Amino acid sequence: MSIEQLAETAQAMVAPGKGIIAIDESTSTIAKRFASVGIENIEENRRAYRELLLTTPKLSDYISGAILFDETIRQKTKDGVPFAEYMTAHGIIPGIKVDKGAQPLAGMPGELVTEGLDGLRARLEEYYTLGARFAKWRAVINIGEDIPSGTCIEANSHALARYAALCQEQGLVPMVEPEVIMDGSHDIETCYEVTEATLRSLFGALYEQNVVLEGTILKASMVISGKSCEEQASIEEVAESTVMCLKSTVPAILPGIVFLSGGQTDEQSTAHLNEMHQLGNLPWPLSFSYGRAMQQAALKLWAKDMTGNFAKAQQVIYERAKENGLAALGKWKG
């Protein structure tokens, strides 16, 4: 795929008023979500749930793409249409999570590095033939006493850059996700410092690996107070700090930035995104790539009656997509 085609896909992913739904939970993660609402974690239930999400009527009004898990990209609708094929036909770009998860970084207590580079070229080639046009790799950066270390940040940046270069070689837009974790008692200033250092390292590594930024999307965490911090930053403070941090680290040539919800409530994640757009003068589109913050209310409703509430749960998904789509334009009213 040419640079022009990668850039075209990346731009479509951050089209005005549209975002990306993350439904790439691993089998173990979806097991926890299902258990919390009393759904049995079997393949057919996982398939049916993904069908509920992906076949929501008019979803493409506010959703440009969806990040899938390996199992999901191989599954079909109840009518026998592969999910990726269904999505493409309905204006939603198929994406695929390709990392193998974060593992302890040897010699660095409390720190993690994401694995999955071995054999990645062949996996990306297969995912492209299955219909994927973008991929996602998540790095995990914890904040704690004397962490993160520069070593941890550099190791994750290097892996993200190698992944991104392989994606572009195989015709997929790389979504790079260096998540600074919300857990902890740190204040918003500490989160800013860590996020800034992480993003500076990441874009340096992308440059060194000859990754074309015009065909790359950043999935960023917001600059926010730690969950157990006594003083929680306001919506305005989160928006201002996040935009300031991004402006100081992210090249303007990047097609766009989407945010992860990272454990924020549904309303917080929408309100923060909306507030960023009130600041104006943004060098790139800012949108969303939410998982739990898009799905949780619909999952609870569906669990009560998996047949009878199917359409009602889809309506909830559509409404959440609409709220976030409006927030991505700065037009959400709360």
UniProtKB/Swiss-Prot annotation:
GO MF annotation: an example: fructose-bisphosphate aldolase activity
Keywords, in A-Z order: Glycolysis, Lyase
Pfam families, per the entry: Glycolytic
Reaction(s) this enzyme catalyzes, per UniProt: beta-D-fructose 1,6-bisphosphate = D-glyceraldehyde 3-phosphate + dihydroxyacetone phosphate
GO annotation terms (biological process): glycolytic process
Family: Belongs to the class I fructose-bisphosphate aldolase family.
PANTHER family (UniProt xref): FRUCTOSE-BISPHOSPHATE ALDOLASE
Protein name, per record: Probable fructose-bisphosphate aldolase class 1
Native source species: Xanthomonas axonopodis pv. citri (strain 306)
Organism phylogeny: Bacteria, Pseudomonadati, Pseudomonadota, Gammaproteobacteria, Lysobacterales
